[in-house]
Amino acid sequence: MGAQDRPQCHFDIEINREPVGRIMFQLFSDICPKTCKNFLCLCSGEKGLGKTTGKKLCYKGSTFHRVVKNFMIQGGDFSEGNGKGGESIYGGYFKDENFILKHDRAFLLSMANRGKHTNGSQFFITTKPAPHLDGVHVVFGLVISGFEVIEQIENLKTDAASRPYADVRVIDCGVLATKLTKDVFEKKRKKPTCSEGSDSSSRSSSSSESSSESEVERETIRRRRHKRRPKVRHAKKRRKEMSSSEEPRRKRTVSPEGYSERSDVNEKRSVDSNTKREKPVVRPEEIPPVPENRFLLRRDMPAITVEPEQNIPDVAPVVSDQKPSVSKSGRKIKGRGTIRYHTPPRSRSHSESKDDDSSETPPHWKEEMQRLRAYRPPSGEKWSKGDKLSDPCSSRWDERSLSQRSRSWSYNGYYSDLSTARHSDGHHKKHRKEKKFKHKKKAKKQKHCRRHRQTKKRRIVMPDLEPSRSPTHRMKSSCVRERRSRASSSSSHHSSKRDWSKSDQDDGSASTHSSRDSYRSKSHSRSDSRGSSRSRAVSKSSSRSLNRSKSRSSSRSGPRRTSISPKKPAQLSENKPVKTEPLRPSVPQNGNVLVQPVAAENIPVIPLSDSPPPSRWKPGQKPWKPSYERIQEMKAKTTHLLPVQSTYSLTNIKATVSSSSYHKREKPSESDGSAYSKYSDRSSGSSGRSGSKSSRSRSSSRSYTRSRSRSLPTSRSLSRSPSSRSHSPNKYSDGSQHSRSSSYTSVSSDDGRRAMFRSNRKKSVTSHKRHRSNSEKTLHSKYVRGREKSSRHRKYSESRSSLDYSSDSDQSHVQVYSAPEKEKQGKVEALNDKQGKGREEGKPKPEWECPRSKKRTPKDHSRDDSVSKGKNCAGSKWDSESNSEQDVTKSRKSDPRRGSEKEEGEASSDSESEVGQSHIKAKPPAKPPTSTFLPGSDGAWKSRRPQSSASESESSCSNLGNIRGEPQKQKHSKDDLKGDHTKRAREKSKAKKDKKHKAPKRKQAFHWQPPLEFGDDEEEEMNGKQVTQDPKEKRHVSEKCEAVKDGIPNVEKTCDEGSSPSKPKKGTLEQDPLAEGGHDPSSCPAPLKVEDNTASSPPSAQHLEEHGPGGGEDVLQTDDNMEICTPDRTSPAKGEVVSPLANHRLDSPEVNIIPEQDECMAHPRAGGEQESSMSESKTLGESGVKQDSSTSVTSPVETSGKKEGAEKSQMNLTDKWKPLQGVGNLSVSTATTSSALDVKALSTVPEVKPQGLRIEIKSKNKVRPGSLFDEVRKTARLNRRPRNQESSSDDQTPSRDGDSQSRSPHRSRSKSETKSRHRTRSVSYSHSRSRSRSSTSSYRSRSYSRSRSRDWYSRGRTRSRSSSYGSFHSHRTSSRSRSRSSSYDLHSRSRSYTYDSYYSRSRSRSRSQRSDSYHRGRSYNRRSRSGRSYGSDSESDRSYSHHRSPSESSRYS
């Protein structure tokens, strides 16, 4: 028939419900009558229902399910819509009519097939000549108009399977009447004759062939329909083969007629090319048998060559389809797969097709697919880079293909952040489902990595995996950081937060991250976080150190800080070892730290792969060193510092001396107060690492400040895990001195201070973490009380410091809990800040606490509904503080995590808002959260609130800091803040487990220095050591309890010892200089605090012991808390509560919460640590980062095993801390522990350096592609950009895991506070709060907070934060903040002197907020760089919002 006689039909196409035009086809009914008739009838729909499919034989409503750019667009599957269905009007398949026409030009209509003689209803329109399809696919028509529609379809984005994301549908189709009449009739006649002859012959001949083949093919099709992928793949091959055969046919035919026809068509095309290119309708009859190999063979590209040979392709494709056909994801395709055409032979011909599995996939897709595949391992490891950590590890990448690359950021997601890290799991699943192939592969890989992390994480995060990871995870999550969506509450929240950070930011996410983050990411702004965080962490560390020192002794801190701070700011700013150098010992160590920061920043990415993931390392494993020369450097420096640490360890007394030298102003205070401050800082650093989150959360105004300073180092540590952690750990672990050095680098001043504090307060640190919890709580209660009193203001500041720690701890905890709810927490914190401010303004503790509880509960609801109950209890506790004591204790049991959360959330938020508000109003609302948190918070509060509040808080912190300070110093040597936190967290976990074996593990506490390093080791060590440490830790806890008990009697002794009760004395002595008129009352409240066990570490132990029978485990845990969490951090009451809850957590999704409750027990320090640890573990799976945190993190992660390991670690930590049981014991223990610690520190120093390094290594080495750390790191990296501080938090998260509590919350906040680290402005604001606390601890917290902030600012945010100062309560804060930021020396001192509570907190907040805004801009840049800017920024905003004020809170919300 003439070209004009040929029938024409049309398709009206719509893309995503929008009509795009009409494609007109001309069918070569003269050449392929049967195929043309099939197509025409399918266009007209006149044939009724198909025999095979039972669907109406009509193209109307069918889709173009396969689009290969520069090749073809395929459609016609009216039954399945995915290339696996469709049938001809003849029933099933019909034979290839002929291959006269060739695929020699574009816009030919050819039949898709699954092999020889498998033509059904599927057709394709070539968009380029496809000679490889000649002899495989039957060309039966061409497009005469609608070319632009075809091109539009061809240019649609498609997935890996070449399936367009858009819905390309034939909304109407039909046959043109004129030709329809003629051609259709002719075709019908011809087709009946030809087609039916063909059909009958097709059916007769093919009856056997086609019948068997058709039936087989039908069955195959049915199978394929069932197994669409396999079928699709096969279908592709067939189609390709069909196309190939059709092309040859068509070419042949087109030669005669085709060319004239083509000229016509070309004319039409030129005319229509602008209009519509109609798909040539492929008649099933005309569709030649497709060489199956070509079309079907994904692996067997030879089929393409078999253009004319249809038989071979038929046979081969089927076989090869089944054998070789592998989906791009590597899945074997069963059946022949969907009908597909081979991609053009050029570059994508059979060979490429083989490679691609479906050559039809455009090269860019292939590349992307390969990239994704290649990335999959990294996706576990490098989530922070491409995706939000929070988003599920696989989810991220997987969703990245699904454009969920920003898996909220979702492996974090981790997550939002919440879902990122933890979403990482949730999203993993979702995304996996979405991207079954990629997701399965990636999800499996990523999820595996992630699960490895999330094994840790999931215990923590599993509940939170709901959101995630993780994500970040996050997040991860786990985003992070960290575990924003983790264990039911803590885990979930932590994981969620992290995931938020990671996913939401971080997911997020979350990282995480959750957190995601965590894990948020806790896991994304890690690199940036590392860079920024590292710089910030260093700055912060220095600031923290300085701040702590300053806080500790405004005067001493100031000058010391001044020298350190300025240097540190510079150093921190530069983030260079050189900066480190300016700080004397600090400098070298700082150099280490800085190097570590750099290493951390750099190392986290590279070294992680160097050796087995740190989590896999044994405690003494060395890959760290090869991985990190900087680790070695840090080791060398740490070794320098180790002696210092040894000195510190050996001499908590020396630490006092060092404190004197380092913080002479605060010497008495320094020993305990400084130790407390340091410890606070450490605790805050540990907790502050956690507090980096915390700090970053700035929710714990002081704690977070301190925590933050430390946390920043931790952040830095996490950022450059070893560095930061080494910073912190080196700060804390490498003998206080190394700590100091590290701290000098990151928290040089902080380090020195902390080192001293640690040396004084290794136990103090341990204590302090506890004590930070306790002290925080004590300070909180003191703070509340003291605040209410005239010394209340000072105490408030001091309490603030403690509270900050507590807040930090709480916040960290909260953050950990809030990992999923990081944002929630940030909001809650922002609300709390508002409420805290309002309450502080209104001074309604209960109210504040209630809102805090409420807010916190919202966060914690996600995190811990049980904790929410606990929170409500905690809120009630807070509200009824007298009842609160027992209630809190009980609540703590039920609400350990909630208490912790509350403490952290409230303390954190309270601290944030309270510090800001304390500083602003110096009201007890922030404190009440802490004190109210304390079981004996009321009793302690009453005692404490007058003087005890500050005094004991500080004393408690100091004592606990001493208790922990020395062990922690030793621990510091080991893991310092990070290690401390991790250890504390672990110790808490272990405290739970090891409360029974407290005493023995003291040496192991030493041993935990390497475990610091054993970020990796920690997990394994945790598992192995946990058992060992558990007894030791329990014994230590018992010892500590005894020490606490003794410390209560021997307040002085315990003071030195680091016991809360003695710490109140010593704290009173030491922290009285810090201006806490409540130190002696602190001593009183210390016992009260013992009542308030949560409030005060020794009191914690006492309290637990008081509640011993009922709280036996609580006592154990509180003991552990006392030991691990003696610092107010845990607020042992909380610890008590934590015990059950911690255990509960351990068991439940609150595994994260368990660590948090363990952390709650050691909450400020260990609790946050643990939570951070959990987060960290989740986020980073950062045992190293969580070495202490690992205990926490690991505990949550490996709820039992890891917790045991964590507790072992913590046992070790506790053991380290434990030596500081009494001042005498502290000295002796310190000496012994120092010696042991020295030995261990020295032996471990390399590891201590590596501890930080290991932390980093844990951060890095430990990072497995799917590990939490990896997620956290990714989150950190991702967060690093978007939320440098958050990133730091995430990065810090591992480090901060050391600061388990703060860090954990900061993990929570590491996603949240990783955001909060970008909330570090928030943290800065919390710093302000910290400063507020430091105001009482006034100088100490606030000043050093200031300084720390300044240093922090100095580093990256010096301006940022400085701007922040100006920006937010820029009024005076601006001046001071700027002063602080501007004159690091001055503002170290200046800030120190400029310690007005409100100022400080304003300043901090200003810094925080401004930093939030500026750093949100700037850090945000970092953080944003991390890619979590939104989450981070949000977190920061939130953080600083709730830090800042209700308005800011609102803003955050």
From Swiss-Prot:
InterPro entries: Cyclophilin-like_dom_sf (IPR029000), Cyclophilin-type_PPIase_CS (IPR020892), Cyclophilin-type_PPIase_dom (IPR002130). It catalyses: [protein]-peptidylproline (omega=180) = [protein]-peptidylproline (omega=0). One of its GO terms (biological process) is protein folding. It is an enzyme of class 5 (isomerase). Keywords: Cell membrane, Isomerase, Isopeptide bond, Membrane, Phosphoprotein, Repeat, Rotamase, Ubl conjugation. One of its GO terms (molecular function) is peptidyl-prolyl cis-trans isomerase activity. The modification Phosphoserine is found at S379, S401, S416, S611, S646, S880, S882, S884, S900, S1139, S1148, S1195. Residues 259-286, 382-402, 514-531, 773-789, 820-852, 859-868, 887-902, 966-982, 1030-1045 have a biased composition (Basic and acidic residues). There is a cross-link at K323, K576, K579, K637, K654, K664, K1208, K1249 (Glycyl lysine isopeptide (Lys-Gly) (interchain with G-Cter in SUMO2)). The keyword Metal-binding does not apply. Pfam families: Pro_isomerase. Residues 221-240, 329-348, 425-460, 755-772, 983-1005, 1369-1379, 1416-1426 have a biased composition (Basic residues). It is found in: Cell membrane. Residues 10-175 form the PPIase cyclophilin-type domain. The gene is Nktr. Residues 903-913 have a biased composition (Acidic residues). Inhibited by cyclosporin A (CsA). One of its GO terms (cellular component) is plasma membrane. Residues 403-421, 651-661, 1170-1180 have a biased composition (Polar residues). Residues 187-625, 651-1453 are annotated as: Disordered. This is NK-tumor recognition protein. Residues 195-213, 532-546, 554-565, 682-726, 736-749, 799-809, 948-958, 1189-1199, 1322-1346, 1380-1401 have a biased composition (Low complexity). PPIase that catalyzes the cis-trans isomerization of proline imidic peptide bonds in oligopeptides and may therefore assist protein folding. Component of a putative tumor-recognition complex involved in the function of NK cells. Residues 1303-1453 are annotated as: Arg/Ser tandem repeat-rich. Its EC number is 5.2.1.8.
